[in-house]
Amino acid sequence: MAAKVKDNNMINESYREIRTYLTINDEMKTILVTSAEMNEGKTTTICNLAKCFGELDDIKVILIDCDFKKRGVSRKLGIGNPFGVSDIVFGNKKLDECIQKVEDIDVLPSGGVPNNTSMLLNSKVMKNLVNELREKYDYVFIDSPPICRLNDACIIAQYVDGTVLVNASKEIDSKVAKLTLEKLKKVGANVIGVVLNKFRSEQYNYYSYYSYYGYDDNRKGIFRRKKKKNKHR
């Protein structure tokens, strides 16, 4: 797996902390991972997060690539199968013909690029596909295009259990982050947290590649810290 990280290091431990938070709710089975803009690390995050869940005994995980144009998941994991989501929705292929096994997880590539991704993602067939996978797997992770680029993520967010945002801490503009949350809230998305990439805290004197914040809707859009990292000595 191209996105594999070394065992027992800080990055791997960060993913395990996120996994712990996400497994608190037994009904949190279908999870969208997206970002506000490009190059914030959402695809790397979702690949490693899916792998982290796949490490658990007797847990079935599937990772779905719904970023039809970029196909980031397929590229990162080295999947050459051209068939996937779009082919299933259009009735050209069956589900078991498209699923690929990558280490401990199953992967469903995006397939061919549809003329209208919004129509595909909003279709009854697509929603039924996600529901079918929800019944077959313990966890379903979905990668999508950035929210400020296409409306695709906002569509998917309406029929998954939860949405996780990935933000590059040094690059994300606060106004863009606020706009992203407003877009998701307008469609009734359940924003369950934020993964903050390449996060440095001078206050706690540590550097972390990934920090996780739960989203507290009662605090008017403020992210509250869920996990405290160990300080470097």
Residue ranges and their predicted role:
Residues A2-N12, R16, T20-E27, S35-E40, ...:
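P-loop/Walker-type NTP enzyme "switch/lid" segment
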Residues F141-I142, L196:
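Hydrophobic residues in beta-strands of the RecA-like P-loop NTPase core, especially within AAA+ ATPase
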Residues E132-E135, I147-K170:
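Inter-motif core of Ras-like GTPase G domains
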Residues F53:
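Aromatic pocket-lining residues of Rossmann-like dinucleotide-binding sites
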Residues L32, V107-P109, F141, V164-V166:
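Structural motif
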Residues F68-K70, K94, G112-N115, I147-C148, ...:
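Conserved nucleotide-binding/hydrolysis micro-motifs of P-loop NTPases
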